[in-house]
Amino acid sequence: MQQKQRFTNVTLVTPSGEEDKDLLIEGDKIAQILNRNENLSDDWKIIDGHNNYIFPGMIDVLQHGFMNYLYGHAEENCTVDNAKLLPSVGVTGFLPSTPCLPPETTGDFLNALSNDIDKAKEGARVLGIHSEGPCFALAGAHDPKNLRNPSIPLAEELLEASQGKLKAVTLAPEMDGSEHFIKRLKKDNISIHLGHSGANPIDVPKFADWGVDAVTHMYDALPTYPADDTGVHVLSLTDALIAESRIALGLICDGIHVHPQLVELLSHLPTDRVFLETDSVKGAGSPTPVKFEFFPGRWCTVEKGKASTYNGLLAGSSLTSIEALQNYYKFSKKSLSQVAIAASLVPAKVIGLDNIMGSIAKNKLADFIILNKDNLEIEETFISGKSVYQNEQ
């Protein structure tokens, strides 16, 4: 018999606003949203929410690592262990993300990562793989030796090696071969993200026609232009991406990658246009500094709220999803409902899972977090209606 739970004395954060109502969970799904004074049969377990928020579980679609693991190292149990830890920072679903991999080992690596995902049975849902690269025009912190040109054979290699788990690919769509590469991936419903690109802004609508539907870390590794000789603002790639309504913009909301005022600017777009992603690396979530090798010869340090190389180049982030939530709420000055759309619903939509997760709504999976109303800290995390993390402080 399925467990029946009634969460009362809570404020539900839904896409339409904050609602002082009860949440009914039956088994692993949300059964109903109910007025507080409505009566039910007595077989429902009553849970007092202590006047806290119920917020949808967060979905991180760009995550290179967390705590002791970098997914680019393909260590055994990397996703198994992190799936158990991520609910502590509000994550109920994530895409372990890969950097630009050596061409000769890409297939073996993706196979190994896919096999590890198969073993992840507890904690946050491992929703698939995000291949950040290898088709970049601008390497950023990635190994430039591993950059490759897009092609149909490469698309098929990524699809086969990931064993059906590929959910998103980031590329620079101005590269030769991109159109056919993108269209091949779209046949398998892969989300295509523009990133590490120096594309001509005029071409953005064409890229959307091909199937580009999102941007990886908006404003980062996307060069802009100075004013021309007459003082006129020159259309930059980021301007064109803002203007293209078919593309959702991924945002690393740590106050370092994107200035808070730019975060506020993006928050004025329609709510389906912005989503939060961490781009976190090994050491994110750690209370002490962590040093690791991103690729042979490229050492990175995670400390003081950022991840960087020895010469100061940003190399992902140390951001956690709960910090991203808190920062977006602070920087955007928007409602908690709009924050939830960016943290949960739009990421789910980007990877085609918004019909079953991403918001507090009837018939969706009961993946949610209890947020303290005073400080927006996590009190408890639920996945499939079961408590998987409790804040003991």
Which residues does each predicted region cover?
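Conserved, mostly hydrophobic/aromatic
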Residues: 131, 185, 215, 328, ...
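Metal-associated gating/positioning segment near the N- to mid-region
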Residues: 50-108
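Active-site metal-binding motif and surrounding structural segment of the metallo-beta-lactamase
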Residues: 37-55
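Active-site core of metal-dependent hydrolases
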Residues: 156, 160-287
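N-terminal metal-binding scaffold of metallo-dependent hydrolase/deaminase domains
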Residues: 1-41, 382
